[in-house]
């Protein structure tokens, strides 16, 4: 490595907000199943605190050695609906509290996996878990919940979509932060290191390390050097930058897995913003030539960014996975917040951007009087984009305040302007229930 590359790396960290957003340990809880919920909770606590006992210390050591910030250390676990189903319990709050206590005791930032996979219907544990979500998130600090309501193979479970519209409302009423820790997915992935949607899939090894990188500031600085150049040059520049970012992510993941004695899973190539100035995906898109994010051309700019990041990342790392696309969370991106306040970015444009990025309606505040059926219809729209386009989509919305208010979440979650919602009703559509069938192109065998 020549001196220029060393200087570039130093600049990435000190001036361009490059960091490893998270190292996430995925832990299988399938061997914690028990017919007694209190025994199951004890087993869950024991396994997490044993397997992840050194996760935070190892993360801090690697960050100090490499001089690269590792912002979060997290844990993801087997969807709790699968564990709880073996019990006769009528709610899974004891399991949520066991997760929370384990997370607090080992010092991680979040623990994900209070989850249910219901794309084709409910089993007993799914229904109980979903009804437990509002209180589980209200009575814990670090637990994150997710529900997968659709997949390209299965279609969309519209009964679950309707339920989740109601659950999101109840969760927002039960606690200030609850709805920010709840994600509704279509085509959820099993190796996602990012919260709030991380869970440890049943097809995964017993324990793995997955890494999520972050580098929108680095990409923006690289694009500043090619202003006025063609799209070919633009794409190549993003690709080379993504290669460098991902290479560091792979190094951190390998070091962590070796020191913790667990397998290395994947590097998630997602560009994840923070509320800090200079760490915004929106500003990357504007650097491409848009006056403000949300104007015409935004979706095309996002498509170029997303594709080039993936191409550069795949070259840098032999194990990529997770969501691996640009994140566009409104409250966590100062450029997105400015675009909403400037009247350039609305819910409809964010929905269009979902066809490209990895999440979609993410960390968006809407008026608290929004009907649960309207929230369910938003989920259905996002799920439809994911199911038809064979990609992951998700909704993380917070019904709080009234249009024009600013809702402060603090930390990485930032501040969200309350956005306008279409006032016309979707209630009769949502009331139908049942299943939207899988698309014709899902039949691959």
UniProtKB/Swiss-Prot annotation:
What InterPro entries does its record include? UPF0210 (IPR007841)
Q: Which residues cross the membrane?
A: none
What CDD domains would the database entry show?
A: RNR_PFL_like_DUF711
Signal peptide extent: none
What HAMAP family does this protein's entry cite?
UPF0210
The family assignment reads: Belongs to the UPF0210 family.
Q: Could you describe the subunit structure of this protein?
A: Homodimer.
Q: What is this protein called?
A: UPF0210 protein Sez_0396
Source organism of the structure: Streptococcus equi subsp. zooepidemicus (strain MGCS10565)
